[in-house]
A protein has these predicted regions:
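A short, N-terminal amphipathic alpha-helix
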Residues: 29-47
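Conserved alpha/beta core of the MobA/IspD/sugar-nucleotide pyrophosphorylase nucleotidyltransferase superfamily
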Residues: 5-6, 160-188
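Short phosphate-binding loop-to-helix
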Residues: 60-93, 153-154
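Active-site acidic Asp-centered loop
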Residues: 96-98
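N-terminal nucleotide-binding beta1-loop-alpha1 segment
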Residues: 1-26
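Conserved donor-nucleotide/metal-binding helix-loop-beta segment in metal-dependent transferases, i.e.
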Residues: 102-129
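Short, glycine-/small-residue-rich phosphate/pyrophosphate-handling segment
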Residues: 122, 139-165
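Short, polar loop motifs at secondary-structure junctions
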Residues: 51-57
């Protein structure tokens, strides 16, 4: 099957794809998911993708493509999703966690513009749980994400990823730190 993309030239259209990465089998806060999907939907991008742990009869919001996750560990699944998205559309990518509270279209646009303009090679948004809520790349690079632990696996996956980006010589655009639904900052 061939994907055909028609892109109208518009000043306010961002030639980037946004991937919403849903971590299975973790329970997901419905309000955070709706907020994240709403922010992605309101951002003028070329492609919106929902990356799920298993592909079946999931509810798929209008305007989103569906990509299944493959691979075992968290970092392997991220690498595979980025590669699969890039294989069908060679556009820069923003991968987001939908459990981050406060994602806005402006945040996504800022990250996308930094990649498109060449100001940055990567975009990174730190998360309150020590992970990250945003990873933006101009092209996939397995070495950056394979071995990164999941947010529920302990350690400091955000710091590890940021260190890898720096070691690779990437210029990194930093997004604001966001709280993660279910962490103490949002519980109470």
């Amino acid at each position: 099957m061939t994907n055909v993309f028609f892109m109208e030239t518009q000043f306010d259209f961002l030639a980037v794809q946004v991937i919403v990465f849903v971590q299975p089998p973790a329970p997901l806060d419905g309000a955070a998911l709706r907020e994240a999907l709403g922010a992605v939907h309101a951002t003028p991008v070329a492609r919106r993708i929902l990356a799920l742990g298993r592909v079946g009869d999931e509810w798929l919001p209008n305007g989103f493509d569906l990509i299944g996750q493959r691979g075992g560990a968290y970092g392997e699944r991220i690498a595979a999703v980025l590669a699969d998205a890039h294989a069908t559309a060679t556009l820069p990518m923003l991968l987001i966690r939908p459990d981050a509270a406060g994602i806005t279209p402006d945040m996504l646009e800022d990250a996308a513009r930094s990649l498109i303009s060449g100001e940055a090679d990567a975009a990174f948004g730190p998360a309150s749980d020590g992970g990250f809520w945003l990873l933006g790349l101009r092209r996939p690079d397995r070495s950056l994400v394979v071995g990164i632990p999941g947010p529920d696996e302990g350690g400091a996956p955000g710091r590890l990823l940021l260190d890898r980006l720096a070691s690779a010589g990437f210029r990194v655009a930093l997004a604001p730190r966001l709280d993660i639904a279910g962490t103490p900052a949002l519980r109470g």
